[in-house]
Design a protein with these regions (language model features):
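Active-site neighborhoods and metal-handling regions in enzymes and metal-associated proteins
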Residues: 1-191
Length: 191
């Protein structure tokens, strides 16, 4: 509280470099009261205040490989709807992680996530892709969409990233990184 989005982005860049990142070419730091209006945006001079949700996303590199990772932070106490939406995003993400294994058509990851969102948030405005591959590029195939019948393969690295616009102009996203192994998904991110 008291710092601007830009201040937080600078501090995060310093921290990432001090922990070994080679570069940070992608770092949206976005805030908004009760949620954010968009997730792909440059940090601004907007000062963080109580009641805000702070969305941090990074596409940092190490040894030529990208990570793609986001988190949401409530400044002060989050509202009930924000807590509820975040919990549903967590459930949707977990449901996708649990079914991810070699041979699974990618659209099934999308389906399990959209079904989770629709079950608990029937009036949501979710659409688009809910994750993608990454590695040598920040965004690589496959895209986790409703119509992608490509099958998961061992050693694919994916971001599982459901998002929901839970009311007009208010969005939350939850993201986890996984690698596909013979027996299922291995979580790469810390929870």
């Amino acid at each position: 509280k008291g710092d601007s989005e830009r201040d937080i982005a600078k501090k995060m860049k310093i921290d990432l470099i001090s922990r070994g990142a080679d570069s940070i070419p992608y770092l949206p730091v976005i805030s908004g009261e009760g949620g954010v209006s968009q997730i792909i945006y440059e940090p601004s001079s907007r000062v963080i205040k109580n009641g805000d949700i702070l969305f941090l996303d990074t596409g940092s590199t190490f040894d030529g490989y990208f990570c793609d990772f986001d988190r949401n932070y409530a400044i002060g106490k989050a509202s009930k709807i924000v807590n509820d939406v975040y919990e549903v995003l967590w459930i949707a993400t977990q449901n996708a992680i649990e079914i991810a294994k070699p041979g699974l058509p990618i659209y099934k990851l999308w389906s399990v996530m959209i079904n989770s969102l629709n079950k608990y948030l029937p009036n949501n405005f979710s659409k688009g892709r809910f994750g993608h591959g990454f590695g040598l590029q920040l965004t690589e195939p496959p895209s986790i969409t409703f119509d992608n019948d490509m099958k998961l393969e061992s050693n694919m690295v994916l971001t599982i990233e459901p998002s929901v616009e839970f009311k007009p102009g208010k969005t939350l996203v939850h993201e986890e990184n996984i690698v596909i192994k013979e027996k299922g998904a291995e979580l790469l991110t810390s929870r």
